[in-house]
UniProtKB/Swiss-Prot annotation:
The gene is hex. This is Beta-hexosaminidase. CDD domains: E_set_Chitobiase_C, GH20_Sm-chitobiase-like. SMART domains: CHB_HEX (SM01081). Pathway: Glycan degradation; chitin degradation. It comes from Vibrio vulnificus.
Length: 847
């Protein structure tokens, strides 16, 4: 750029520019011909110079867009894609200046569509050449859980009109409104607090409720030599959080009695007038028995029901995945996350610590991984940080920056162990590895400058002579580790060794290591290092398509030599040569994430039949970065499904994936079909997953995960009577939302809905007050309501949650269903927690 710009010009622009955006339309009539499937959307950007000086023409504005630009419609402004979601606005030779007090507007096209306000990424920033970047002040997000409020400083968001709410003409899904929610939630009966007081989540195998109750006003005292001290401490913390004293009061006798006929984690719990007795078949069972005792507690009550429970887990693996790479989240959040996992008997924590956007774990001997790879700021050379992504902005600190020290990680391991949770670390490779690649390139440059070629090349992950051109699914062009270089395996061996040491020091020996294994289509083809392998018969690699299989096989031997089991996403294991028996070591684990409508239905059984231990992780049911409902005011991506509400999570039958098609549609609401194939092996378990691209704060994590996580815990622990058994050769077709399909599930739908009513009543009356006591910012239900005959009628998704209404948007009143208020025109309604936190308010209009 020209030399007539300095840091003062950048600072002035960031301070005095007011940048706002608005959606013009999804799929305008003149989409550029290069738009994939002819789909694009158009955004208007307004630049207002609120200062007195003219804007320097050499100032550049950077911003994040998860969809790649198709170009500007303006003659004065150019918009170009940089890498990932990072884009840049520059002026053209036709730019006529932007004087103080003036505004310029222009329109930009992007690929695909936009129907959630979380697609509007914050922290536009100003920069030029190697000057320091500065965030444009009005685009800095407001600290809020609700997305529309968070981005309200710079975007008007998506309007409730067809050309903005609908992605294409084939989008059949109705928008969520107060009326549609009313119609849905009115079908769920309010059972009342007394009816669910003796019931817990996840649902036990057998529960007998007896007459009478046990007073625990003085507290409970866990008496056990069977449980280690750290687990007793964790359990006491659970009770104290719920307001129950520990170390005094009613004795809780906990013992272990081995029984080989029962599953690990099985237990019995007896609450009688004389005391409490828990017998586990092992330490896990004893621990879960005490958690079930906590489940009997109703916040604010001094008594629990007298019951007898005989219980065992349905599936061995009951997990949650948390991505801290896209946006970093605090150690304290991880602790709270583990607390809630333990409360609902989840036992596997899939900890996603490295991806394109960040490396989050300190690795001894490789400081660049956290010095560079753990931070995002404006550094074109990427010697001190990664370039901004996902609206992280130019300035430090930000939500895209941070990492766990070695001591932090060991604390997390100890905290998880005390809650009977295994931590499964995941560093994504060879794809999704930009942070690692750029960190090692920075290391390379540092040692080359010192003249130490051996050190420089020791851990290098990229071939500097590779001219391959590709785009990853997130629009990166350089995010893939090169498996044709020996230094890549030296790096991975080093990382795995260091993580292995951390687990030993943290008291939880490493057994499973998740390598991600995502493949970047189109990578490596023009790498000279790879071309050497293509002509070497002993390599077994004939072309670029064989490289990922070679990589997986080689990593399996590295892990096996260390006594570790390989885990990976199923797409990375899809190479034709990669049956489980072809890989070294124990049967590998495959986390299968096929969607219902992209042919993913068949992948679950297919990988199990190949000998993999399958963890069921369907995006269109168990991905919690998807919105709760079809409303632009709900945060989340929607590439797999337009919404995953709690009932949908609850209803998903994990052991017969094709059968779910009968009550589901594709992401546009169209009919889908699936046929059950051969299934020779049972699945290992289930996992909910949180990817954090749109989730910047700890509170937003809790909002997106809970209460949906409890529904995954329910399906992982308890097999419901209404779940369809797997039978080969049965075809299922959508029979919902106006589609006439198969009716295999008809007899079970009413039973499922009654079970949902029971589950949701327990959530509202018992579990949400417990989450309040724990300080969890879970999603309060958005209400359904209508005004009929001048009477306001309001319903909630979870009975037991308090409701408020307002006639002026300022004064709020408690809603009493027995004395429904008179309203002539409109009202606002919202839910409110037991500790005074309020849910998203919605407007209700009289018909």
């Amino acid at each position: 750029m020209a030399s007539d710009i300095d840091q003062k010009d950048v600072d002035y622009a960031a301070k005095n520019l007011k940048l706002t955006t608005s959606l013009v339309a999804n799929k305008p009539k003149d989409c550029p011909p290069e738009a994939p499937w002819g789909a694009c959307y158009r955004v208007e950007i307004n630049l207002e110079n609120t200062g007195s000086k003219s804007l320097n023409e050499n100032v550049e504005i950077y911003f994040s867009s998860i969809h790649r630009t198709l170009g500007s419609k303006s003659e004065e402004f150019k918009v170009e894609h940089i890498n990932g979601d990072l884009h840049k606005i520059t002026t053209t030779e036709k730019f006529k200046g932007l004087k103080g007090g003036k505004t310029k507007s222009f329109q930009v096209d992007f690929m695909n569509w936009i129907v959630s306000n979380s697609d509007f990424m914050p922290n536009y920033y100003v920069a030029s050449e190697h000057l320091e970047g500065r965030n444009i002040l009005n685009t800095v997000p407001i600290d809020a859980v609700h997305i529309t409020e968070e981005v309200s400083g710079f975007t008007t968001g998506i309007k409730h009109t067809p050309n903005q709410l609908k992605r294409t003409a084939n989008d059949l899904l109705p928008a969520a409104t107060a009326t549609t929610r009313y119609e849905q939630y009115s079908k769920v009966k309010d059972l009342g607090a007394d009816a669910v007081s003796a019931h817990i989540l996840p649902t036990p195998l057998e529960t007998s409720v007896h007459e009478g109750s046990l007073n625990i006003a003085q507290g409970i005292n866990i008496v056990s030599d069977a449980l280690p001290a750290d687990q007793v401490e964790a359990l006491n913390f659970r009770f104290e959080t719920l307001g129950v004293n520990t170390g005094t009061g009613v004795p809780v006798n906990v013992t272990i009695k081995a029984d080989s006929s029962k599953k690990s984690g099985s237990y019995t719990l007896d609450v009688t007038s004389s005391g409490i007795r828990i017998v586990g078949v092992d330490k896990a069972g004893a621990f879960y028995g005490v958690q079930s005792l906590a489940g009997l507690v109703t916040v604010g009550k001094d008594t629990i029901n007298q019951v007898s429970i005989n219980d065992e887990p349905r599936l061995d693996y009951r997990g949650m995945h948390m991505d801290v790479s896209r946006n970093f989240h605090s150690k304290e959040l991880v602790f709270r996350f583990l607390d809630q996992m333990a409360a609902y008997k989840m036992n596997k924590f899939h900890f996603h610590l490295a991806d394109d956007e960040g490396w989050r774990l300190e690795i001894n001997g490789l400081p660049e991984l956290t010095q560079v790879g753990a931070h995002r700021c404006h550094d074109v050379e990427q010697n001190k940080c990664m370039m901004p992504q996902l609206g992280s902005g130019a300035e430090l600190p930000n939500n895209g920056s941070g990492y766990y020290t070695r001591e932090d990680y060991k604390e997390i391991l100890a905290y998880a162990s005390a809650r009977n949770i295994q931590v499964i670390p995941s560093m994504d490779m060879p794809g999704h590895s930009l942070a690692a690649v750029k960190s090692m390139e920075a290391r390379y440059r540092k040692f080359m400058a010192e003249g130490d070629v051996v050190k420089a090349e020791m851990y290098l992950l990229s071939d500097p002579n590779d001219t391959t051109q590709y785009y990853s699914i997130q629009h990166y062009q350089d995010n893939t580790i090169n498996p044709c270089m020996e230094s890549s395996f030296v790096f991975m061996d080093k990382v795995i060794d260091e993580i292995n040491k951390l687990h030993k020091e943290g008291g939880q020996p490493l057994t499973d290591y998740h390598i991600g294994a995502d493949e970047t289509a189109g990578a490596w083809g023009d790498s000279p290092e790879c071309r050497k392998m293509f002509v070497a018969p002993e390599s077994g690699v004939k072309n670029a398509k064989d490289i990922n299989g070679y990589f997986i096989n080689r990593i399996s031997h590295i892990l096996d030599a260390k006594g570790l089991t390989l885990g990976a996403w199923n797409d990375g294991l899809s190479h034709k040569a990669l049956d489980a028996s072809s890989l070294a070591g124990n049967p590998p684990k495959a986390w299968v994430w096929g969607t219902m409508f992209w042919g993913g239905v068949d992948q679950y059984n297919s990988f199990a039949n190949k000998g993999y231990d399958v963890v069921v992780t369907p995006p269109d049911a168990y991905y919690f970065d998807m919105p709760y409902e079809n409303d632009p005011e709900e945060r989340g991506y929607y590439w797999a499904t337009r919404f995953n509400d709690t009932k949908k999570v609850f209803s998903f039958m994990p052991e017969n994936v094709p059968a779910n098609v009968e009550w589901m549609t594709d992401r546009m609401g169209a009919k889908i079909s699936a046929t059950t194939g051969e299934k020779t092996h049972d699945f290992l378990g289930v996992q909910g997953a949180l990817w954090s691209e749109t989730i910047r704060t700890d509170a937003q994590v809790e909002y997106m995960v809970l209460p949906r996580m409890i529904a995954v815990a329910e399906r992982g622990w308890h097999k419901a009577s209404w779940e369809e058994e797997h039978k080969e050769g049965i075809t299922y077709t959508s029979n919902v939302d106006g589609h006439e399909g198969t009716t295999h599930l008809n007899d079970n739908i009413a039973t499922r809905d009654a079970d949902w009513a029971h589950f949701s009543n327990i959530l509202g009356y018992k579990e949400m007050p417990k989450l309040d006591k724990a300080g969890i910012t879970y999603r309060l239900p958005v209400l359904g309501a209508v005004i009929k005959n001048n009477i306001l009628d309001v319903v909630t998704e979870f009975h037991g949650v308090a409701i408020q209404y307002s006639l002026d948007g300022k004064t709020w009143h408690k809603y009493d269903d027995t004395k429904k208020p008179q309203v002539s025109t409109k009202a606002l309604v919202r839910s409110v927690s037991t500790n005074g936190r309020t849910g998203r308010a919605v407007e209700v209009l009289a018909k």
